[in-house]
């Protein structure tokens, strides 16, 4: 009994190791297949770019070009069609004739130039990040611009003195108006003072009458 017990667990141990080896072989085989050549989309774009036909490259002509490049067209026929559809949807290829994978295809010049532009944009974006930091500095300048707001507030205070000055000016005309009536009563007072001067000759008459009384006394 003791001899048979260790033999039973020893049997499943190699059974567990074998699937690990199979998985490793499958992953190595998949890696070899992927590394065997470039993807279908790159081969299609190269074949379409190499053609000089203005109307575009047909599917049959494209397959011939791929076969000449050493690509197995018969086995990968479905991949070629899927690659064409994906390139058309992305905009790298333009379908001039037909629908789907069948028809004629032409390289999109805008997309070809656009592929080179993103690289330049990335380099430009890295440079643009530094000016972004410089753009933050003007924000500090906006903080310095806040005194302008306070400067705008001060004129409001200046307006109040101006209004007060206007009020004082408005008050001063009242004083001037009051001064005019004061001068007016003075002039009649002078006129009254002139009248008594004219009345003095009247008082001289009684003085002339006094000698008459003296003459009467002498009598």
UniProtKB/Swiss-Prot annotation:
Q: What is its main location?
A: nucleus
Q: GO biological process: what's one of them?
A: negative regulation of DNA recombination
Q: Which residue stretches belong to region Disordered?
A: 1-41, 92-219
Q: Which residues carry this modification: ADP-ribosylserine?
A: 150
At what positions is N6-methyllysine found? 26
A single GO CC term for this protein reads: euchromatin
Q: What residues bear N6-(beta-hydroxybutyryl)lysine in this entry?
A: 34, 52, 64, 85, 90, 106
| Keyword Acetylation (UniProt) | yes
In what way is this protein post-translationally modified?
H1 histones are progressively phosphorylated during the cell cycle, becoming maximally phosphorylated during late G2 phase and M phase, and being dephosphorylated sharply thereafter. Acetylated at Lys-26. Deacetylated at Lys-26 by SIRT1.
Q: Which residues carry this modification: Phosphothreonine?
A: 18, 146
Instruction: Show which residues constitute the signal peptide.
Output: none
List each copy of the H15 domain by range. 36-109
PTM sites of type N6-succinyllysine: 34
Q: Which residues carry this modification: Citrulline?
A: 54
Please quote what the entry notes about the protein's domains.
Answer: The C-terminal domain is required for high-affinity binding to chromatin.
> What name does this protein carry?
Histone H1.4
Q: Which organism is it from?
A: Homo sapiens (Human)
